[in-house]
Amino acid sequence: ILLKESEDGPWSALTLFFRIVYTPAGRGNALFLYENPNVEESLPNVHNVVLHDNEKMARWLAENFIGALPGPFSESPAFKALQYVPLTECYTSGDTSSKYTQTVKAEGIEVDLIWGQLGTPTALELSPEHVGTRSHNLFNLLIESRDASIVVNGRKLPGQVVPRRQADIDTTTGFVYFSEIWIEP
């Protein structure tokens, strides 16, 4: 979920959630949360954090995936200040046809990623020239959300989803990928 307070303004909050089955660094869950992507700081002032159950995998993602993607996640000041915090709970609720929620908890932190007004699932098969890293084939199921939000400790972060063109598809910045597979050709 990528949020802005106005379509032409800066990013106001960003998240990427991963439920990983295989990487060279193992498996696990990781939530990259940029409560304020525009500042190079983290706890205790701002939740620019990575909540994880496998720090080695989370750092591998930051270095080999997030850091390789051009755009807001690697280029935001928050990326340089991320703190890695072990998660204590990670679960989903809702369904993938109307409203879906991913909840991630850590000591003193509770995050709900909420995708509402879900669109029709679209299967994607993308070659490296259409993928952010430019070095992977990508297979996944994209579901657009026209009303997504990020809630941290009961407080909804500012911003809303905005239009986005992704993989030659008009969608929004409130999308969820399922069954995502990255392959180095």
For each predicted feature, which ranges?
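Targeting-peptide/extracellular-domain and disordered-appendage signature
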Residues: 1-185
